[in-house]
Amino acid sequence: MAHLLEKTRKITSILKRSEEQLQDELPYNAITRQLADIIHCNACIINSKGRLLGYFMRYKTNTDRVEQFFQTKIFPDDYVQGANMIYETEANLPVEHDMSIFPVESRDDFPDGLTTIAPIHVSGIRLGSLIIWRNDKKFEDEDLVLVEIASTVVGIQLLNFQREEDEKNIRRRTAVTMAVNTLSYSELRAVSAILGELNGNEGKLTASVIADRIGITRSVIVNALRKLESAGIIESRSLGMKGTYLKVLISDIFEEVKKRDY
């Protein structure tokens, strides 16, 4: 029991990770490595859309084809759909099973390979799947207890992180709406014309040229840019005689201006 408690503490310590670590490209490499080291297996975590969130390989089991999934950090749709249909931990799936993570073309090399898939969900929301696999040794009850704990820990983190991201998105959209509301009719026309000049989210523009084209004064454009820049929506830099370099920091401005039909 003490041995299991020690392993459990190692896994739950992942909750102490910072938000900055969760914003990494593969935020759950640490917990998959801990789990792989404790249980002696390969491990990976995918979200409900199949994006790879973290993985660690103790054993070489992938072919070049499957290795590509880990390189691109996205799993095939059919596998993801199957994983999302698993509502309780499915343990020790043989290589012949459709949800085995062992590549079809290498199953003869790993005839005793076993896959375990644990759903990651919190409050009825499906967030992803935790997948572990071994070449030839069955996952015992103690291993499965740790997997259940790990999936719960990851689920709590994912849900909290998702809520934080949702709150950030709301604050961002609110900032854009408030900034656009401060613009006059002429300034809105100017902003619409300016955004149309950009190549994606950034580009070079000449205020006097835009002003002449839409029939407003250059000062209107300058005032509009100043308001958006003070709100943190854009940043600009004078290029002297060449015009002004503009970069959009909050892309929601495109949709907000479009909604106003300017």
From Swiss-Prot:
Keywords for this entry?
Cytoplasm, DNA-binding, Repressor, Transcription, Transcription regulation
From the UniProt entry, list the residue stretches annotated as the region GAF domain: 1-159
Q: Name one GO molecular function term.
A: DNA binding
Q: What domain of life is recorded for the organism?
A: Bacteria
Q: Which Gene3D superfamilies match?
A: 3.30.450.40, Winged helix-like DNA-binding domain superfamily/Winged helix DNA-binding domain
> Which CDD domains does the entry mention?
HTH_ARSR
* Tagged with keyword Repressor: yes
Q: Does the keyword Secreted apply?
A: no
Pfam family of the protein (one): CodY
Residue ranges annotated as transmembrane are none
Q: What is its main location?
A: cytoplasm
Tell me which InterPro entries the record gives: ArsR-like_HTH, CodY, GAF-like_dom_sf, GTP_trans_reg_CodY_C, Transc_reg_CodY_N, WH-like_DNA-bd_sf, WH_DNA-bd_sf
Gene Ontology BP term (one): negative regulation of DNA-templated transcription
GO CC terms in record: cytoplasm
Portion annotated as DNA-binding? 207-226
Family per record: Belongs to the CodY family.
Question: What is this protein's function per UniProt?
Answer: DNA-binding global transcriptional regulator which is involved in the adaptive response to starvation and acts by directly or indirectly controlling the expression of numerous genes in response to nutrient availability. During rapid exponential growth, CodY is highly active and represses genes whose products allow adaptation to nutrient depletion.
Recorded hits in HAMAP family, A to Z, give: HTH_type_CodY
Q: What is this protein called?
A: Global transcriptional regulator CodY
Q: Say which species the protein is native to.
A: Streptococcus pneumoniae (strain Hungary19A-6)
